[in-house]
Curated annotation (Swiss-Prot):
Gene this chain is encoded by: rhaS
Function: Activates expression of the rhaBAD and rhaT operons.
Taxonomy of the source species: Bacteria, Pseudomonadati, Pseudomonadota, Gammaproteobacteria, Enterobacterales
The keyword Transcription regulation is annotated on this UniProt entry: yes
Primary residence: cytoplasm
Keywords for this protein: Activator, Cytoplasm, DNA-binding, Repeat, Rhamnose metabolism, Transcription, Transcription regulation
GO cellular component terms attached to this protein's record: cytoplasm
Effect of G247A: 6.2% of wild-type activity
Domain HTH araC/xylS-type: 174-272
DNA-binding residue intervals: 191-212, 239-262
GO BP: positive regulation of DNA-templated transcription; regulation of DNA-templated transcription; rhamnose metabolic process
Induction (free text): Induced by RhaR in response to L-rhamnose. Binding of the cAMP receptor protein (CRP) is required for full expression.
Database matches in CDD domains: cupin_RhaR_RhaS-like_N
The name this protein goes by in its record: HTH-type transcriptional activator RhaS
Length: 278
């Protein structure tokens, strides 16, 4: 597995923060780093396989990656990221207690993926741009300024994450997308789902299309197919069983949709013919 080292990304040995844009981020094999990072998805879509679990990411997704986490990107489509790198929560010169603002693992569950709405994403971009402008400065005031901006970024993300902000339809849509990640195999009634998240069906269709480029059902089908592809690669379950586990009631229909989406059959993926296992 590829290991990325801080010496290749941080501007100096004492820099606590670095900005690494990926515009766009292509498919990238599994790796980990000797530093931490906050991945901010600007726009586009892709699959983020994080510690073996696939997540669909779109504009507004924020992922917190620790130095022992492993992850990869695949099936990217105009995926643009900004990575905010930091050495460790306790490696800042002027800040202490940052760990309290970061996601916490509880009973083996780590809430790595958050979502923010478009207006918050704009504020995030401004903070990141200010940090990036100061990267070449190594004096104490500049270091303190960058660390203060990093603290502001964490506060903004925490206050604006789905757990704490459901005031507008964009935030409720983000919560719906997070819900689909956990309920993709369920039979989905879009009228009922829209009601559940206090959205009109028209608003749901319009905003989901704006954010992902897909209609709700197309987005759900792609999510199911992504989950199925992951299981084909990493489990011994039969194609039929995987189809049912991912929300498809007809394995033949599943195979047709799968080939249309990936240009490979489920059997091809299982046997590694797409090159993933080579």
């Amino acid at each position: 597995m590829t290991v990325l080292h801080s010496v290749d990304f941080f501007p100096s040995g004492n820099a606590s923060v670095a900005i690494e844009p990926r515009l766009p981020q292509a498919d990238f094999p599994e790796h980990h780093h000797d530093f931490h990072e906050i991945v901010i998805v600007e726009h586009g879509t892709g699959i983020h396989v994080f510690n073996g679990q696939p997540y669909t990411i779109t504009g507004g997704t924020v992922c917190f990656v620790r130095d022992h986490d492993r992850h990869l990107y695949e099936h990217t489509d105009n995926l643009c990221l900004t990575n905010v790198l930091y050495r460790s929560p306790d490696r800042f010169q002027f800040l202490a207690g940052l760990n309290q603002l970061l996601p916490q693992e509880l009973d083996g569950q780590y809430p790595s993926h958050w979502r923010v709405n478009h207006s918050v994403l704009q504020q995030v971009r401004q903070l990141v741009a200010q940090m990036e402008q100061q990267e070449g400065e190594n004096d104490l005031p500049s270091t303190a300024s960058r660390e203060i901006l990093f603290m502001q970024l964490l506060l903004l993300l925490r206050k604006s994450s789905l757990q704490e902000n459901l005031e507008n339809s964009a935030s409720r849509l983000n919560l719906l997308l997070a819900w689909l990640e956990d309920h993709f195999a369920d039979e989905v009634n879009w009228d009922a789902v829209a009601d559940q998240f206090s959205l009109s069906l028209r608003t749901l269709h319009r905003q989901l299309k704006q954010q992902t480029g897909l209609t709700p059902q197309r987005y759900l089908n792609r999510l199911r197919l992504m989950k199925a592809r992951h299981l084909l690669r990493h489990s011994e379950a039969s194609v039929t069983d995987i189809a049912y586990r991912c929300g498809f009631s007809d394995s033949n229909h599943f195979s047709t949709l799968f080939r249309r989406e990936f240009n490979w059959s489920p059997r091809d993926i299982r046997q590694g013919r797409d090159g993933f296992l080579q």
